[in-house]
């Protein structure tokens, strides 16, 4: 819900967008996926995210940050960004060396994959909270509390040994603390300020209905398609009058190449009960004007159009044939 966060961002930065502060949280975080095939081979993937919007990538060949938007630099200077770039490079390299040189101490068993997420969350402009979460092969491994790494129960002795090793390096602990408590919040606010024109945009959804036969005879699977909307938060429900149909099933919200979103919401219903159903869509771009499509109305319009146009076309064809015949007889 990025567009809502600007309501309190303006207050934090001393702007004048609104006098009301919306109680919303927003986070910026970096994600890491490192695959270790053996002692000599590792592949790193890195990315940066503003809530659910990817803002940065990581080129593992050149060890450089990829800025995915014109505003992805926030308000940081080139020097600050270069320092962060060097820091990420040192982190990836140092982690790989540590794992390769101390396999027995860390109980390393190849192959394995490390997934990590580190960043900060801004709570309505009041305070920030830093976080680090890491998993190995999909199982929780460690988290961050009070300037220290804390092992997760699922991580076992491996997690305990890794955290004990990390926590002995006071300089690294202070650097991590500074990054998530100072650097990250400043960068987050800079992103929101630099990208507000793009992040605040509102794109109305297009909505249409369809159906497909169900495996069970006499039933239909009704689908409400909502496409091309931005921002991502949206509410879609099958309705009968003012009554929400609790059997409504929502699919995943999928991205389009242009940054907008697509959603499909379905309802399994007896064919004889389909009449009177409608799909209702609420989105910030619509303000208070919900989109409501009634099942069967579109079909009725098509049938009416078909019933009017087809006889008209046939009549025109018959008139042309009759005229042609009369002309031919006149020549004879």
Swiss-Prot record:
Residues 322-332 are cytoplasmic. It is a single-pass type I membrane protein. Residues 205-292 form the Ig-like domain. Pfam families: C1-set, MHC_I_3. Residues 1-17 form the signal peptide. InterPro entries: Ig-like_dom, Ig-like_dom_sf, Ig-like_fold, Ig_C1-set, MHC_class-I_related, MHC_I-like_Ag-recog, MHC_I-like_Ag-recog_sf, MHC_I/II-like_Ag-recog. Coiled coil: none annotated. One of its GO terms (biological process) is antigen processing and presentation, exogenous lipid antigen via MHC class Ib. One of its GO terms (cellular component) is external side of plasma membrane. Glycans are attached at residues 25, 38, 75, 146. Keywords: Adaptive immunity, Cell membrane, Disulfide bond, Endosome, Glycoprotein, Immunity, Immunoglobulin domain, Membrane, Signal, Transmembrane, Transmembrane helix. It is found in: Cell membrane; Endosome membrane. Its main location: membrane. PROSITE patterns: IG_LIKE. Residues 18-300 are extracellular. Disulfide bonds join 120-184, 224-279. GO terms for molecular function: endogenous lipid antigen binding; exogenous lipid antigen binding; lipopeptide binding. The chain crosses the membrane at residues 301-321. Heterodimer with B2M (beta-2-microglobulin). During protein synthesis and maturation, CD1 family members bind endogenous lipids that are replaced by lipid or glycolipid antigens when the proteins are internalized and pass through endosomes or lysosomes, before trafficking back to the cell surface. Antigen-presenting protein that binds self and non-self lipid and glycolipid antigens and presents them to T-cell receptors on natural killer T-cells. This is T-cell surface glycoprotein CD1c1. The gene is CD1C1.
């Amino acid at each position: 819900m990025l567009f809502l966060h600007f309501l309190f961002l303006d207050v934090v930065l001393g702007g004048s967008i609104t006098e009301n502060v919306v109680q919303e949280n927003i986070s910026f975080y970096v994600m890491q996926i490192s695959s270790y095939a053996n002692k000599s081979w590792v592949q790193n993937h890195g990315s940066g995210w503003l809530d659910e919007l990817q803002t940065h990538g990581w080129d593992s060949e050149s060890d450089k940050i990829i800025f995915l938007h014109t505003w992805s630099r926030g308000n940081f200077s080139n020097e600050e960004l270069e320092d962060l770039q060097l820091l990420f490079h040192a982190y990836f390299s140092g982690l790989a060396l540590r794992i390769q040189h101390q396999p027995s101490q860390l109980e390393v068993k190849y192959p394995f994959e490390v997934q990590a997420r580190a960043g900060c969350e801004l709570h309505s402009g009041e305070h920030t909270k830093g976080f680090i979460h890491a998993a190995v092969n999909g199982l929780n491994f460690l988290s961050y509390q009070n300037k220290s790494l804390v092992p997760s129960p699922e991580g076992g002795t491996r997690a305990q040994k890794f955290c004990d090793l990390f926590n002995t390096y006071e300089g690294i602990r202070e650097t991590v603390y500074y990054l998530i408590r100072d650097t990250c919040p400043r960068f987050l606010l800079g992103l929101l300020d630099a990208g507000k024109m793009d992040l605040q945009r509102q794109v109305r959804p297009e909505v249409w209905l369809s159906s497909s036969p169900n495996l069970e005879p006499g039933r239909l699977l009704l689908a409400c398609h909502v496409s091309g909307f931005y921002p991502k938060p949206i509410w879609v429900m099958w309705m009968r009058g003012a009554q929400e149909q609790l059997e409504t099933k929502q699919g995943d919200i999928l991205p389009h190449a242009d940054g907008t979103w697509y959603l499909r919401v379905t309802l399994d219903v007896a064919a004889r009960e389909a009449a009177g159903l409608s799909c209702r869509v609420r989105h910030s771009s619509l303000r208070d004007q919900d989109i409501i499509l009634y099942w069967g109305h579109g079909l009725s319009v098509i049938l009416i159009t078909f019933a009017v146009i087809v006889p008209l076309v046939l009549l025109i064809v018959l008139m042309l044939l009759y005229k042609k015949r009369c002309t031919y007889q006149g020549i004879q």
